[in-house]
Amino acid sequence: MPDLSAEAIDRMTPGELVTLVENLDPQDAALPDVDIDAVARLIDPAELQDDEFVRLIAGMQRLAGASVDVTKMGPQTFARMIDRASKDQLEQVLVHPELRDLILGEIFRRMQAHLRVEKAAKVDAVVHWRFSGGTGDEGFDRYETIISGGTCTVNRAMTNDARVTITMPPQDFLRLITTNASAPVLFMTGKLKIRGDLAFAAGMLGLFDLPTP
């Protein structure tokens, strides 16, 4: 078992940290003590080769079903990772269905926690999200968010008629929800497509506390 103390982790280079995450044994009894947020804070994607970034996310995906709680990565840490990752790095990760599911699933899982309850208290809306390059119907990965009574529920099945349907590449979605991209710019360049209530869609992100790098 490698030395997982804070002091040892602080001495590692980003590449060594990637190798550490990649080689951790999911069955090791010491894994619950690993501070995954501290590890991620020390890794700058800009200092990694594209394959190293893929290996990092793959390592986290492998640990997600073990005793390391990858959901404990803080929102600011996650936003910084997306901010520092290159377009090629994000695209290479998102072509892997299991890694794509990990990242998108974690974002939607956190939506309830980041909902501004006071702003959403009187909102009643169903939003359908379609991400291109997926494995679902017509080549899209789909998520449904239901905002009602100050809560946000997420489904993979489309259970209700949508007030608005949003279609976009997943890498642009990652940049959008970590405030690394502008919705108007994405819309004007055709990367963000909206069907339905445009006025609601324009203000929808304001219902959430978006993390900043």
Regions found by a protein language model. Give the residues of each.
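Feature captures hydrophobic
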Residues: 1-213
